[in-house]
Regions:
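Substrate-binding/catalytic groove segments of enzymes
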Residues: 163-164, 176-182, 215-222, 241-243
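The canonical Cys-X-X-Cys-His
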Residues: 65-77, 124, 152, 163-174, ...
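Post-cleavage N-terminal segment of exported redox proteins
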Residues: 2, 7, 15-51, 85, ...
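Short cysteine/histidine-rich zinc-coordinating motifs and their immediately flanking basic loops
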Residues: 78-86, 179-185
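Extended amphipathic alpha-helical interaction segments
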Residues: 130-182
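Solvent-exposed, glycine/polar-rich loop segments of beta-barrel outer-membrane systems
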Residues: 184-191, 250
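N-terminal, post-signal-peptide region of Sec/Tat-exported proteins
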Residues: 41-74
Length: 251
């Protein structure tokens, strides 16, 4: 462990997780350099363009024994991505958008669910999310969904891993500071699924959360785990009112 990293760890370990005031919230877009911003702004030749085209094709393609496409049931999905994760009364649990689309695929199209984090599901999610781009995030909190919000908030503030760090210590208390030469963002999930230059591909919010857990040397959950959905729900609520950027680009 280098001296610089050790000192940084001491600073982060001592920091308290004070929530960011609503007026001071900033999208990760604002922490990026000019060239990376230009990639996100270019929807025609930007790095996410191919996933959007694949998503549109999947949306229109008939699938399953029902021989139906998403387009056969839904004229458009404007505003939908801005409302997820959402509570499903029939299943008595929170669902994120990928889970909801897979349920529709299985129950309505009579087709196999798409694998979580697969190119197909990421493409479809990006295409659906793109229709809400520029719209404010509107997460509904009800009596039945509040326990999931509280669980997500607790996870965000809980120290974990061998480094004994919480999400809040980085993204509430130390945002804007530099870690290994990179500005620490506020961790608002305004652009998922997004194209990450580090990955050279699209990825979901859960992929990013797994990366963070591995970074603090904690054991990551499996994709689709309830713990991730609760944290997603809290993070989207934390970003309420901010504009959706899907599909975003990040370093």
């Amino acid at each position: 462990m280098t001296v610089r990293f050790f000192l940084l760890l001491l600073v982060f370990s001592a920091a308290a997780g004070a929530e960011i005031p609503l007026a001071e919230r900033r999208s990760g877009y604002e922490f990026m350099g000019r060239e990376t911003r230009a990639m996100q702004d270019d929807e025609v030749t930007g790095p996410a363009a191919l996933w959007l085209l694949d998503g549109e094709a999947l949306w229109k393609r008939k699938a399953g024994s029902a021989d139906k496409s998403c387009a056969d049931c839904h004229q458009g999905m404007k505003g939908v991505a801005a409302r997820y994760p959402a509570f499903d009364s029939a299943r008595n649990k929170m669902l994120n958008l990928d889970q909801r689309m897979n349920i529709c695929r299985v129950e309505q199209q009579k087709a196999p669910a798409l694998q979580l984090e697969s190119r197909e599901l990421l493409s479809l999610s990006a295409y659906v999310g793109r229709q809400s781009r520029g719209m404010p995030i509107e997460i509904a909190v009800t009596e039945r969904s509040r326990p999931f919000l509280d669980a997500g908030r607790a996870a965000f503030n809980r120290r974990q891993g061998q480094l004994n760090l919480s999400c809040a210590q980085c993204h509430d208390s130390n945002w804007g500071k530099s870690l290994a030469g990179t500005p620490i963002p506020q961790a608002h999930p305004t652009g998922y699924p997004l194209y990450r230059l580090e990955w050279q591909s699209m990825g979901s919010l859960q992929r990013r959360l797994r990366n963070c857990m591995i970074g603090v040397r904690a054991e990551p959950y499996a994709y689709g785990a309830p713990e991730y959905i609760e944290l997603e729900f809290f993070l989207m609520w934390r970003a309420r009112g901010m504009k959706l950027e899907t599909p975003a680009v990040r370093p």
